Amino acid sequence: MRTLVYQRRIHLAASPERVFEFHLDPANLRLLSPSWASVTRLVLPPRFGVGSRLEIGVRLLGLIPQRWCVEITRLDPPRELVDEAISGPFPFWRHTHTVTPGEGGGAELVDRVEYRPPGGMLGIWMDRWTTRLMLGLMFRHRHARTRTLLESPETGGA
């Protein structure tokens, strides 16, 4: 089955090191979660490292329960963090967070998700109206929250 890719980038007025450190703190995961994907269970390590696992329970739109177990499979500070689903709703899921210096200062954050949607060929055919739509909504929210949290004067940002 074909692997699909979703990618979104954002420029942040924060150093690449600060952006990377923010993503290394598991507590920030709850801060980035949209309200329509309410976190019902979160078992986190104190800090992410290769081999770290986290368990996440979410309820999409308040109705659809999902359980995930995700493992950090690559860590290249301050540039790259990769997590892969060990179990969850997707047959395959790899999320790569890449942080690089931004043009003119700051940092560029790229979230790249490689995935195989559930439902086989029907899942691939429906991807535009299901998984891709949800990923777009989720990462727009996550990037907006990341910007707020890293750039606001109250949180020590720009």
What are these regions (language model features)?
Residues R41-S87, E108, H141-A158:
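Glycine-rich portal/gate segments that line the openings of hydrophobic small-molecule binding cavities
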Residues T3-R9, R53, R67, E80, ...:
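Intrinsic-disorder/low-complexity, polar/charged segments enriched in Ser/Thr/Lys/Arg/Asp/Glu/Gln
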Residues V5, I56, W125, W129, ...:
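Short alpha-helical segments used as structural interaction elements across diverse proteins
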Residues R8-I10, R41, R67-R74, A85-I86, ...:
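Hydrophobic/aromatic beta-strand elements that line small-molecule binding cavities or substrate pockets
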